[in-house]
Amino acid sequence: MQALDRAGYSFRMVFPRLRYQISHTTFSAVFAVALYVACNALNFAKLARWFQDAGGTDYSALVAYLLAGFCLFLGFFLLFAHRYTIKPFAILLTVCSGIATYFIVKYGVAIDSSMIRNAVHTDVTEVGQLLSAQMIPYILLLVILPVAAILLADITFESPRRYLWASLKLFVLVVSIAAASLYIEYQAIFRAGNASNKYIVYSLVPVNVISGSINAASKAVKPWFKKQQKDMEFSAQVSRPGNLVVVLAVGESSRRRNFSLYGYERRKTNPELEKIAGLHLLDAVATRASTLYALPKILEKNDIMLTTVVSRAGVPTVCYVNYTLYDNCVAVGETKVSNCGHGGKCFDEDVLPLLRQDLATYKSGYRFVVLHFGGGSHGPLYRERHPPEFEQFKPPCADADVANKCSVEQLYNSYDNTILYVDHVVSQAIDALDKSGVPYVFIYLSDHGESLLEDGKLFHGVPPGVSLPAEQADIPLIVKASVPIAIDKRAVYQQPDVFDSVLNLFSIEAGPFDLEGSFIARPETVDPR
């Protein structure tokens, strides 16, 4: 706080003629109006379309919604509008809101708790890939200039009693207006929220940033305590010993419709997997389009991690990852790729040497290996997800600003190159298992798919609770085994079924799990190595 005060003082000394004095209540109101109007004006058309009915746009409901959002924002800001917090909080909101507005306008993303948590966990390299020259005007007009105006302000406060009373009166006023607005137009606003799959909520800046941050903080803390308690409450044991290595490989953003194995006709994207006999190609669906929330759908159930259950049953368990599994492997820890052979840059194939080393130590019994192919088909710079030699489909999209700098053809070329590389990595993992001679079951699936400008949508990241478009929901599920297995025929397979299937393959009995979702029949006997 003191550092910020000194920075503001120095800034005012450099630009003395631009200094201005303003009361804390006036500053709060002006700041809230300026930030709210500037950010949402850029997205107004997309918001307004959800308030249309047979007679045109329902402006009364739209105005009521926007007014309620503004009043709630101002009311929340007043809670922090104190002598030592008002400027830091205003600057923080300005920076976050400006960046959020850019991604909402340019990519149509929705800002909720999952997006906030993703932003916190995003790799530095991925952050750099999202930056482009298109962002400069947004940063200048929505961040730099407003922050300068905040630093130049000499905010005055009356006595504590008087300024608290003034804040309280304004707080009660704006909250009352918000409540009245929502009450009067409740039905119309509710319909717009449902019709838009809550888009009107997740795109209203900075209300979305504030609510998303609060929910993200809450969700980050609560599950940890719940998991710690549940981890202590259950037991797991192997009911029938055997010899089997189960390898679960989790991909990233690779959608099923671009796999030629599944009938993709644009080009052949799976030349290596097509040569492997005995593949089981299953249609699976994801229900979460954010990696942070999608991975637990595969690796967690009843707030207990799969690796925790398997390791507690006495099965040796390891996790080899490119990027991270977001704390879904804490029971045994992650082993991350390192010393990669592409000039220090790591790709998904760099996980494979770890797998080969592990298989070389296998003698007998059960073993569980989780592989994370975290590069996968993640945008926006798809060409960064594979070595240069896999850039077979040209011309690629070479810019992070996909929506403005690349054609649809370039976008598909780049994305299909990632699928070509996924094909190589998955086939090499199967090859490593075959050459090792171990009895194995190999399972590959992606955490979610990806939108490539279908209906104007790009990438992924739909908030939890909102139905996914097909291109983000439909994912590949590929199974290969060196031992006899039977797979239940289903129209579609769910990600949580993988959890049950792994436990079933190891004959693990654990109190909290009934294994009803298992789609791989447990072999009656597993031949020793």
Task: Map each language-model feature to its residues.
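A structural motif corresponding to the C-terminal end of an alpha-helix
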Residues: 306-315, 425-438, 480
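Phosphate/oxyanion-binding loops and surfaces in catalytic or ligand/nucleic-acid-binding neighborhoods
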Residues: 102, 130, 313, 436, ...
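Transmembrane and membrane-interface helices of multi-pass
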Residues: 2-202
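Active-site rim elements
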Residues: 196-200, 408-423, 430-431, 462-466, ...
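Histidine-centered active-site microenvironments of extracellular/periplasmic hydrolases
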Residues: 263-268, 434, 438-481
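Hydrophobic, well-ordered secondary-structure elements that form the walls
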Residues: 426, 447, 476-477, 498, ...
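Active-site-proximal alpha/beta segments of enzymes that process anionic O-linked groups
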Residues: 182-248, 253-399, 474, 495, ...
